């Protein structure tokens, strides 16, 4: 691998400078403007901490932060508790229909938070199909609203991420380690907790960070089913909307608090991961085996049950999309009426929903490949800057990034708020870190030989 410690103004040097310029315009400038607004008195133009004092002195606002921590920590713990054992079962046992189950688990994590929350309202809302079923049997079950519902929806959407991370890490464990543990009398559940979990702990910490960040920044789920249980992103959005046309300082201060919190969580995770980091060399990967009769039935039951519950919202939404409706009420019969209505009334919105992500996807892939090449093959002081800049959006909640872009580009000469450009830019900046991580860890290895 080349080790170019000095910057050279060639083609790759120009690309490096251009990449830094793009980050400076669409990331650093909005974030700096956001921080400026959070400490600027709109009347006098002087420095002030009044907005931060307001947030921490009023229990209404401060409690939303506590609520978000409760939700995020609980969802993270449950996601780890579900995703890790599930990945272990998939790795060591032969399970019928495993390829289909793998696809379904990925699909379960793909729906937007709004869709997931809406789906569970149809199932466990006050008039949901499951709620009504048990009500007819004379059994009262908790509805989906409030803390429990938020945690349920987030967990079922996010445990697949832990599953994918853990499953990848389990492939790197040498089977001889597990065999040695079994020869010493450590097998089954004991082997899982004493041998397997410590070996994949760095990966689990990375997955936990991702789940925590996602759940902490989730706006759609608590907005739809939180009711009286208000979380940090909901209050941030509400305050920003209330301040549109006026001073946006308080919303900016809340956004800065979110950045500080997620940054601290990220740094703690990195510190703990580095303390527990070690290399795994899988000379003899774990081989799938048939479980004993009784265990085999239990394994299949657990796997099918977890995957079935996770995919249930998506399956039910697809099913109801074909049902006939009268207004907001489902009636007997099936047709494509709902699709015709949606395309007729929301054709332009559907078109934008397809075009904007596609444009962002093309740019993300191109930038990720370039950044991976620069970081791996053309490493110098400036490419290190590119590497750091590309990771900043990883720790910035999506709501915060959106507000920063709206505040930063809401006045001439950089007036692009309300345009397709700012939506594409937001998606690129927000999702680029995940693609960069992929390319710099895996695809970059191939670039080394170029």
Region spans (language model):
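Juxtamembrane helix-boundary/capping and inter-helix hinge elements in multi-pass membrane proteins
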Residues: 94-96, 171-176, 186-188, 227-230, ...
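Alpha-helical transmembrane segments of integral membrane proteins
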Residues: 267-302
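Peri-membrane helix termini and adjoining interfacial loops of integral membrane proteins
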Residues: 40-48, 125-136, 227-234, 276-283, ...
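Glycine/proline-centered hinge or cleavage motifs at structural transition points of membrane proteins
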Residues: 184-186, 198
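Membrane-water interface segments at the C-terminal ends of transmembrane alpha-helices
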Residues: 11-42, 58-171, 199-219, 253-269, ...
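Conserved small/polar residues in nucleotide/adenosyl-binding loops
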Residues: 181, 439-444
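Interhelical loop and adjacent transmembrane-helix boundary motif
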Residues: 6-12, 52-60, 216, 222-263, ...
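Short amphipathic alpha-helical coupling elements at transmembrane boundaries
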Residues: 54, 102, 175, 179-183, ...
């Amino acid at each position: 691998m080349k080790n170019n410690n000095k910057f050279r103004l060639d083609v790759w040097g120009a690309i490096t400078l251009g990449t830094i310029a793009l980050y400076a315009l669409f990331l650093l400038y909005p974030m700096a403007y956001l921080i400026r607004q959070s400490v600027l008195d709109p009347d006098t133009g002087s420095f002030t901490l009044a907005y931060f004092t307001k947030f921490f002195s009023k229990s209404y606002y401060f409690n939303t932060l506590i609520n978000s921590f409760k939700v995020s920590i609980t969802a993270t713990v449950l996601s780890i508790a579900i995703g890790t054992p599930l990945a272990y079962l998939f790795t060591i046992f032969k399970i019928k229909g495993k390829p289909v189950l793998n696809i379904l688990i990925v699909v379960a994590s793909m729906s937007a938070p709004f869709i997931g929350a809406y789906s569970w309202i149809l199932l466990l809302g006050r008039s949901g199909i499951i709620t009504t079923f048990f009500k007819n049997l004379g059994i009262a079950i908790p509805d989906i609203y409030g803390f429990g519902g938020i945690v349920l929806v987030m967990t079922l959407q996010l445990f697949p991420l832990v599953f994918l991370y853990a499953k990848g890490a389990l492939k790197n464990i040498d089977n001889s380690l597990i065999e040695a543990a079994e020869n010493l009398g450590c097998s089954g559940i004991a082997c899982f907790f004493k041998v397997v979990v410590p070996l994949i702990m760095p990966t689990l910490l990375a997955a936990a960070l991702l789940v925590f960040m996602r759940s902490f920044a989730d706006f759609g789920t608590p907005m739809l089913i939180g009711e009286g249980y208000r979380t940090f992103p909901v209050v941030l959005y509400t305050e920003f909307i209330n301040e549109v046309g006026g001073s946006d300082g308080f919303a900016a201060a809340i956004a800065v608090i979110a950045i500080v919190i997620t940054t601290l969580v990220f740094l703690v995770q990195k510190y703990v991961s580095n303390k527990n980091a070690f290399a795994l060399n899988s000379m003899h990967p774990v081989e799938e085996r048939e479980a004993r009769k009784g265990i085999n039935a239990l394994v299949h039951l657990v796997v099918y049950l977890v995957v079935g519950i996770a995919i249930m919202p998506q399956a039910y939404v697809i099913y109801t999309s074909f049902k006939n409706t009268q207004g907001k009420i489902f009636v007997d019969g099936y047709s494509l009426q709902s699709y015709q209505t949606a395309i007729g009334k929301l054709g332009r919105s559907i078109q934008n929903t397809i075009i904007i992500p596609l444009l962002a996807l093309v740019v993300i892939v191109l930038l990720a490949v370039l950044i991976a090449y620069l970081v791996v093959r053309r490493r110098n002081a400036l490419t290190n800057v590119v590497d750091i800049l590309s990771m900043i959006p990883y720790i910035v909640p999506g709501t915060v990034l959106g507000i920063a872009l709206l505040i930063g580009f809401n006045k001439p000469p950089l007036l692009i708020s309300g345009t397709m450009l700012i939506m594409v830019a937001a998606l690129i900046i927000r999702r680029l870190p995940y693609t960069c991580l992929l390319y710099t860890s895996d695809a970059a290895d191939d670039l080394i030989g170029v």
